[in-house]
């Protein structure tokens, strides 16, 4: 977006286009290169731990979400980005594609990856609400996050992109009679039963 911003902003205003920015980008707001590369050395405990107990620098490892100061740092980084881009209407706050979540003892106690994902999204959405009242935060129901979390209920102020990445297009995505779509039909019904916010169908063609 930043590369094309100068060209596209006038067209956006002319056409009253709603702008969504973000994506698979937790790692853009806190990573081993932050603070000139000094952050990992200063706070290794903020970074995701692998199954062997090692803190990892790689961007696909999600931060240690049980570390409140790490989450606060990430939120401050998100706020800085949004202040510099006031034109954004919807902020897609998604984990890295193929994310590896922290396996420290405290993070394991938080539950599944889906539970940790929803917990973090709720925290970020709440932190942004006062300063950015016009903004919609969006998250994914996708792959390991396809089914709704149960322990952490997603805030209805957040939009959900329901992403049936492997659906069969020969029938409707919610057709439980289609073996390929059955899990999506089940998951979509669960989302509708437990979530009062907006659900978008993010389809792949």
What is each model feature region?
Residues 1-205:
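Aromatic-lined carbohydrate-binding surfaces of glycoside hydrolases
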């Amino acid at each position: 977006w930043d590369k094309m911003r100068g060209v596209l902003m006038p067209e956006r205003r002319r056409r009253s286009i709603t702008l969504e920015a973000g994506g698979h980008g937790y790692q853009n707001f806190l990573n081993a290169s932050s603070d000139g590369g000094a952050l990992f050395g200063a706070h290794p405990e903020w970074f995701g731990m692998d199954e062997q107990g090692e803190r990892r620098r790689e961007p696909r490892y999600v931060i240690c979400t049980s570390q409140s100061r790490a989450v606060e740092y990430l939120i401050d980084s998100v706020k800085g980005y949004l202040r510099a881009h006031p034109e954004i209407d919807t902020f897609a706050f998604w984990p890295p594609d193929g994310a590896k979540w922290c396996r420290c003892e405290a993070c394991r106690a938080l539950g599944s990856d889906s539970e940790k994902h929803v917990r973090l999204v709720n925290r970020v959405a709440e932190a942004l609400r006062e300063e950015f009242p016009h903004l919609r935060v969006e998250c994914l129901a996708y792959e390991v996050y396809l089914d709704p979390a149960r322990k952490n209920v997603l805030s209805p102020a957040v939009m959900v992109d329901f992403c049936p990445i492997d659906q069969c297009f020969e029938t409707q995505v919610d057709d439980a009679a289609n073996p390929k779509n059955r899990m999506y039909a089940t998951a979509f019904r669960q989302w509708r039963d437990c979530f009062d916010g907006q659900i978008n169908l993010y389809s792949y063609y």
